[in-house]
Structure formats: C-alpha cells, structure tokens
C-alpha cells in the first residue's frame, strides 16, 4: 500500500502538456527496446492499458521530453513492429543481443545523432522530466542515468532493486543488487534505521549515451562483473566509461506482471487520462 501511495503521488507530477522548447547542445534520440518474449508477461508491449498498447503509452511520454529530437521503437518482433508503426518510427533488430545496450547500438549505427536515451518499454507513466535530465546530461557527459532515494524498507534488501553509489562528482562508483554501501557501524540495525542513517540510492533503468560512447561500449564483450550481477551498466564501468548519475525525486511505476495493468489503469483514471 505504501508503494501504491508513493506511485500515485509521483504520477500526479507527470506532465501531460506540450513540452518546452529544447535548449540542449546535442541532438538526442530516444529509443525504446521492445521484446515480445517474456517469462512473466509474454507480449507485454502490446498489452492494452486503458485502450492503448503499453508501448504506445511509453512513446507518448517520451515525446513530452523536449530534449528528444525523435522517438524510435527498437524490436525484433514483427507483431510489435506492426502495431508501433501506427504511431512512431520502428527499427528492426537482431534477436540475439545480450543486452538492451547492444540492441540500442544496432539502431544507433543507422542514426544521425549525437546522443541516445534508452527508455524502458514497460514504464507507461515515466515522467518526461526524468528523460529530460538524463538527456541534458549528455551535453557534458559520455553516459548518464538516474537514481532516487530508497525510502521503502522492502526495497533495501530486494535484489530486483538495483543500488548505486556515487563519488563526489556525482558519477557512479558501482551498481549492485546487494545493499551498498555496507554500514559497518549500523549492521545490526533494522532496514528503517539504516535508511535513516545513510542516503541509499536506487538506480532507475534509464540510460543516456553519447553515440560514439555507445558504439565503443558494445565492442567489448560481456564483462565478468556484468555477468555476475546481470547488470549491463557494469560493462561501462569495467572499461573506464564514466556514468553521470542524476538524482531525481521519482518513483517509477512499471508493468512487470499482468496484474500491474489494473494498477496503472487506476493511476491513469486518478489523473483523468
């Protein structure tokens, strides 16, 4: 229930109006990777959310981010492509990519742009402001992402909630499914007490890349750390690519299971959409 309330509060801040004029110095394209196969929710990108396919709702939110010059769906499935072509550009990709970054890179080779933002295809309520700040960071950084404070003790030890620690310059030191850092002097305390003692950060699954950085990154094989944690961003850190972490006050509302559809539809109804 607590997560639901936070999600509703966050969703009330999502902007549905027209975007402001862009002021960035690099041309940035948004790419949404979409796969049909899913163990928990096959065909998820085409699931209807209040009458619209999930992938369409993600595209519409991306288009409200003024920093994006274009929004593209990248898929290896003709069923997704057929639907997505009704409302945006589609690029077909190989089905054999080991990560979303590799899929995005295939599309990047065909694009005339300076930067790319990889937006998760299962977040129909993603705040355009989050996309905006990740894209803007590419004016000065080779790679960027976003993080928010962990407030829910249920997320503290959850391996599906990826944690990140950053240095004084706001760049990632490490990402992990384990709780990091380890609070040695508070190890015996409860999760609530540890959250009060240190500003733990939760990684949000959105990535910005300079095009050249992305194309260089995917030349490297899957790294040992990436393979161990199953976190693709660790390949970048392994090879010395700095990742700027933009801190935002945002709680994502994703669609992971079929039952999440009703939750998102309730939030849309609450917002009058």
Feature locations, PLM:
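Short phosphate-binding loop-to-helix
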Residues: 72, 78-133
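A residue-level structural signature of the nucleotidyltransferase/glycosyltransferase Rossmann-like core
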Residues: 72, 123, 163, 206, ...
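N-terminal glycine-rich phosphate-binding loop and ensuing alpha1 helix
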Residues: 26-74
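Conserved alpha/beta core of the MobA/IspD/sugar-nucleotide pyrophosphorylase nucleotidyltransferase superfamily
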Residues: 189-273
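Acidic, Ala/Val/Gly-enriched low-complexity intrinsically disordered segments
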Residues: 9, 14, 20-21
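Conserved core of the sugar-phosphate nucleotidyltransferase
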Residues: 126-223
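A conserved hydrophobic position in a structured secondary element of the catalytic/binding core
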Residues: 75-76, 126, 209, 256
């Amino acid at each position: 229930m607590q997560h639901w309330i936070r999600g509703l509060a966050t969703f009330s801040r999502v902007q549905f109006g027209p975007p402001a004029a862009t002021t960035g110095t690099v041309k940035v394209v948004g790419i949404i990777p979409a796969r049909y196969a899913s163990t928990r929710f096959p065909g998820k990108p085409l699931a209807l959310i209040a009458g619209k396919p999930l992938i369409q709702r993600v595209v519409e939110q991306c288009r409200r981010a003024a920093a994006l010059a274009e929004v593209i769906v990248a898929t290896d499935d003709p069923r997704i492509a057929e639907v997505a072509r009704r409302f945006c550009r589609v690029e077909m990709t190989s089905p054999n990519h080991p990560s979303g970054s590799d899929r995005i890179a295939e599309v990047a080779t065909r694009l005339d742009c300076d930067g790319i933002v990889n937006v998760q295809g299962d977040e129909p309520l993603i705040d355009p402001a989050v996309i905006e700040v990740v894209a803007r960071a590419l004016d000065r950084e080779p790679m960027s992402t976003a993080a928010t404070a962990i407030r829910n003790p249920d997320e503290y030890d959850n391996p599906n909630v990826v944690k990140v620690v950053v240095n004084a310059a706001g760049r990632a030191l490490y990402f992990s499914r384990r709780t990091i850092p380890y609070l040695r002097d508070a190890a015996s305390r409860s999760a609530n007490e540890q959250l009060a003692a240190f500003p733990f950060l939760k990684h949000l699954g959105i990535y910005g890349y300079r095009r050249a950085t992305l194309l260089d990154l995917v030349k490297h094989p899957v790294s040992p750390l990436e393979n161990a944690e199953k976190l693709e961003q660790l390949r970048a850190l392994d090879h010395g690519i700095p990742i700027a972490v933009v801190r935002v006050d945002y709680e994502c509302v994703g669609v992971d299971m079929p039952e999440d559809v009703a939750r998102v539809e309730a939030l849309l109804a609450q917002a009058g959409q």
